[in-house]
Amino acid sequence: MGRKCNNNDYLREQYSKYIKLNKNTINICEGNYARIVSDNNSKLLGVCLRGTDYLLYHHPMQPQIEVVVKEAKKYFKLLNCDYYYIATEDYALLKSFEKYLPKEKIITYNAGNVRQVDGLIGEQIRKDKSATDAALDYLTTLYILNKCSVLIGGKCRATIVASYRKNPPYEYVNIIDTHKSY
């Protein structure tokens, strides 16, 4: 059983089989997607980095933004993408991406909505929103990551779930594991 849980094809099959979004949730996610992507045929490159709020909790350390940007630029050009979809809750990370990538090519959904945090970012988000709204935002982020053709990012729950939830699989995926934790 342990080997199967590390197999993305197996996880993708299980996810598709057992985890289904209801029609209302799909409509909400699709509506949020349509608000940021004007052309449904646009080819997106998803970039996902989590914030650094887990310093005391031994979560995976995220790669340096320069490493992610270099890889993203390479595959954006190689695979003829139209937009970078940036998925991060961290305002400072979003601003860093805007320094390295052309702003007119960046799209986001609620990215950078946390500017200062004292504790966990998730706790901060839940102070500002209901649990339902926070969950719908997270599902929308995953939904849009699954609309992308490419996924590049640091090791975190969102990149891992997005990688095996996408069916068919991405044209290219790289979840960068620094093999370090905070």
Predicted regions and their residues:
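Hydrophobic beta-strand segments of well-ordered beta-sheets in folded domains
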Residues: 42-45, 82-84, 105-106, 148-151, ...
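Catalytic donor nucleotide-activated moiety binding site of glycosyltransferases and closely related
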Residues: 48-53, 79-130
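Glycosyltransferase-associated regions of secretory-pathway enzymes
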Residues: 59, 121-126, 177-182
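A donor-sugar binding/catalytic signature common to diverse glycosyltransferases
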Residues: 137-180
